[in-house]
Structures are given as structure tokens and as C-alpha cells.
Amino acid sequence: QENGFDNVENKIKLKVKNNNEDYEITKILADFYRIEKKYDLAIKIYSELIKENPNDLWYTYYLRGICYEQSDNWHMAELDFLQSLKIKRNSPNVLNYLAYGWIERDIRIDESFVMLTEAYEENPDSHYILDSLAWAYFKKKDYVKAAELMEEVIDMVPGEAVSLDHLGDIYFAMNRKREAVYFWRQAKDLAKPEDEISDKIQIKLKEYDAS
């Protein structure tokens, strides 16, 4: 697999070199690193693109922000998402990523709720945005609305471990503990071992003698 990565990397690098550092091809290299979770390499190239190219700046800030967030550097991610929104105020994906990050940290809940409502109006078909909006209702302790929306998410993407885990948390807050445990178990079965939520779900299952 590493050999396959090297082959693709070298091919894209050669194209970049042969095309005088062409913006679009260079961006493909950055995107390749991001998809392959080589976030430091992706950040370096996105930073060069931001410095040298005015094209699609809002989107490049957004992609670099994702890399920072995935590298557990929320401070830098937050700055990039905010910068992206300064350039393009109503991008639903950027609104969603930033607002969800705040909600997960229990900060700026009301502001995040407004942003997610706007994002959902812009893109009602995104299960990611609907999940975030449902989670915002949960954080505001409107458990009935949170459950209603998260159930919609599960209808859209039945195998999404994060959403199943969220629904379990919502049901638990509503004192529907048996259903909560059921969805936590489903989430645990579907989550990849390296996923952050796996350990968190295991702790919840152990705590309630349900594993």
C-alpha cells in the first residue's frame, strides 16, 4: 500500500514540475495528501497556494482548516474556517465544520445553532449538516427535536457510526436507556478500531453494564 502511495505521489509531483507549478495540479497534490491523511504535507502545500494564488481562497482555507482539525490543532483550524467565511459568508460546509467544532467544545452554542440552521437551509440534503443541527438541539437540551432530526439522519445513512452514537446519547438523555444502549452497540460495531469514538462508546457501554 505504501508503494502505491509513493507511485501516485511521484506521478503527481512530476506533473506539477512539468507544468510550472500549475495551480490546479499543485492543488491535486495537496488534496491527495489530505485524502491520504498526510496532513502536514497537505498543510504545507495549501499554505503555498494561499500565499501565491488568489484563486478559490475561501475553499483553500477551508481545506487547510480540515487538515488542521484532523491534526488536533483546533486553534489553527478555527482561524482558517473563520477566514474562509470572511471571503464566502454562506458556504454551508464551512459553517457546518466550524459550528460543529464549537459545539463539540461546548462553546458558542447559540451562535453555532444559528450557523447550522443557515447551513441546513442552504443544503438540506447533507446528512452531515443535519447531524450537526440535531446535535446543536441536543446541546440546547431540546431532546425531542434532536431525536427527530437524528432519526432522519439514520434514515438517510443507516451505517454512520457517529450519528448512531449521537442518537444513543440523545435517547439516554431522554431516559430511553435500552434504546440508547442498542444504538451505542450498533455504532461500536460499525466504527473503525482507530476511530476516536470507539473508545468513548466502550466506556459508555461498560459504565451501564451493557457491553
Would you name each region that the model predicts?
Residues N18-N19, E52-N53, I87, E122, ...:
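Structural marker of alpha-solenoid helical repeat scaffolds
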Residues I25, Y59-T60, V94, I129, ...:
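TPR alpha-solenoid repeat register
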Residues I28, Y62-L63, Y97-L98, S132, ...:
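Canonical tetratricopeptide repeat
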